[in-house]
């Protein structure tokens, strides 16, 4: 029904093969520029353009710094090939522009505009409405793309800004259950406690979930989070084998994990 001028795909390793098939079909039918972004295409940007003829560009780094300015130039009919993080073909070669710097202050990013979505509630009641509360993880687990994509730099939006987003989406869509999108939400204990305090002061009840490492959370923090509406928490334990913990550079103290899980 629609004839888009650009089609972009957010890529992950677990579904990259599906994205490739979809992109191939879109290119064959519409002929519009195909752009890949996200962690999988970011890591293999050169290989993607060398091996996949129907992908025209790869945007590396944070979308606000790369995808947005490049898309804007394409829609103007004046592609800006100087955008940091852009990877493209030129005269048979692959050109990889310098990677953009990470956004220092995530509070400067505008709220996501969901008005173009269908009119029904843009949230999954089972997993929560996703809000980007921060980015990055300082740890170096060998299997994880986070350390490569975000550069092992931990960033968290301010408690005030996170609360403003909760209120905004609650007031606009009536949403009361949120998924706090961050690989390591509990890294900054003081900030997490302040976020929980602000949530408790809301005139209505909200619920939420998050992700954390088992060595960056304890019973006291769990109680504080639960009192502010925490419904469940995803703990990245990965393996119960001490040998495998070392091999993948996770290095958790496994003897502390089971008591914590039982408490949760």
Where are these regions (language model features)?
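Alpha-helix termination/capping residues and helix-transition junctions
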Residues: 1, 51-52, 80, 138, ...
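Glycine-rich beta-alpha loop elements in corrinoid/cobalamin-binding modules
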Residues: 2-102
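Radical SAM [4Fe-4S] cluster-binding motif and immediate context
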Residues: 107-264
